[in-house]
Amino acid sequence: DTKQKLKECLRREKKFYRSSKSLHDQCVEWVVKDPCVRIWQYQKALRYTEYYYCQKGLKKLIGYPLFRHRRNRLGLKLGIEMMEGSFAPGLIIHHAGNIVVNGWARIDEDCQLHGDNCIGNDGKSLKAPRLGKHIDMGVGAKVIGDVELADDIVIGAGAVVNRSFLMPGITIGGIPAHELKKGELHEGKRM
């Protein structure tokens, strides 16, 4: 809601896209329209849209439509559709293309999307998924309906999650998704 929170969120998320690259490499990526640059531009527009949505008066009147238009335009090019307010800070989009997130979905910190993902309702109800912290969605993974996922869950590639998983630190996969194994953490990262 505040400018400081916006800056902190952007600083945190930018690390994934630009952390160890030299200025020369960053310039080359920008000139050749590298997918990482485009995804970062989209993510930045998403966060500014969220910021201006929470403002009042002239700031909201001018800033919100401007950044929402930019987010939508970049989203059309990249195949990403997300509404403001769905993701807590720490979102990482590894690959663009066919990513759809329902505006009512709520995803906690440090979610990773690997492409071709859907987080949405089931078509029978307007209720959308609620995902905990540190969710890693593999390529093609879908989370559908009024479901809740605990923290530290890895969703395997191609999985369709249509029920809740409330035990943290597990790996799920399959159609419909089921528990594959208990998660193993090593130095704070899943193996």
PLM features: residue spans?
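Terminal amphipathic alpha-helical/low-complexity segments used for targeting or macromolecular assembly
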Residues: 1-78, 185-191
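Detector for the N-terminal beta1/A-loop initiation region of ABC nucleotide-binding domains
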Residues: 81
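Left-handed beta-helix
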Residues: 84, 89-90, 94-103, 108-109, ...
